[in-house]
């Protein structure tokens, strides 16, 4: 449904009250996407699937992605949005804007805005990140980030400030990846003290071109 790193690294999963590793966040589905170049036109997709849980929750999804490159300034803007209608959970809308620029051959400055609306909660959570990404070698990358997380409900709009380092390593042929993510959280509600979190994660990716099978 969502790459495990995506919501947890932005801090949104904790605001939603979920766990970093939750089987109810898994789904299986198929999506047909246009083959256009995102730097020249919108890449649109339409998909169907089922989200796991009790009960199973079928869904239909529309997605759209676009990229803008500014050659003179080297800035790049990426937009990715998707609208999902679940049978049980209702409407969900997710939007991500990524603005980035290379600093040198190995480092990139990036600003990301992420918004997630869920009809069943009648609220939207968001995060804003400022980060420096560094490519250490062909299999290893490191990111330093400041993340601000919020929600349009509750006592405070801003829920958490996060300082994060994110180490990612390709440990087997671009299929199996290892992540180590230490964080320092500064929550703004509930009189909570700052705390340290450490995430260790393995992710496996299986890719294929189904069109070759027919």
Which residues make up each language-model segment?
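Outer-membrane beta-barrel initiation region
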Residues: 1-38, 49-61
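Short helix-loop boundary/capping segments
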Residues: 78-139
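Solvent-exposed loop/turn segments connecting transmembrane beta-strands
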Residues: 19-27, 49-59, 84-93, 116-125, ...
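Outer-membrane beta-barrel channels and translocator barrels
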Residues: 35-41, 69-72, 102-106, 135-139, ...
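Membrane-embedded beta-strands of outer-membrane beta-barrel proteins
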Residues: 28-32, 62-64, 95-97, 128-130, ...
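Transmembrane beta-strand segments that form the barrel wall of outer-membrane beta-barrel proteins
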Residues: 15-19, 30, 40-52, 64-65, ...
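Outer-membrane beta-barrel "beta-signal"
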Residues: 193-214
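Intrinsically disordered, low-complexity segments enriched in Gly and acidic/Ser/Thr residues
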Residues: 115-177
